[in-house]
Amino acid sequence: MEGISIAKLLIIGALIVLLFGTNKLRSLGGDLGSAIKGFKKAMKDEDTSAARTTAEETPAERVSHKD
């Protein structure tokens, strides 16, 4: 089995450009980039809020039982 060669990748790329056009591909790339940025920002915000919550928690009081 040969796999995908450079020539096949170029043909597939040319077909995609012909089907969608360069403007559509640019807008899709921009949308994908902003979605990834938003995801990274949300993950970063979640990490900082989780760290803040952990730091703000106070230890529980010990309960002593009388026998």
Swiss-Prot record:
InterPro entries, A to Z: TatA/B/E (IPR003369), TatA/E (IPR006312), TatE (IPR024905)
Subcellular location: Cell inner membrane
Pfam families from the UniProt entry: TatA_B_E
Keyword tags: Cell inner membrane, Cell membrane, Membrane, Protein transport, Translocation, Transmembrane, Transmembrane helix, Transport
Region (Disordered): 44-67
Role: Part of the twin-arginine translocation (Tat) system that transports large folded proteins containing a characteristic twin-arginine motif in their signal peptide across membranes. TatE shares overlapping functions with TatA.
Family of this protein: Belongs to the TatA/E family. TatE subfamily.
HAMAP family: TatA_E (MF_00236), TatE (MF_00903)
Protein name: Probable Sec-independent protein translocase protein TatE
The species this protein was found in: Pantoea ananatis (strain LMG 20103)
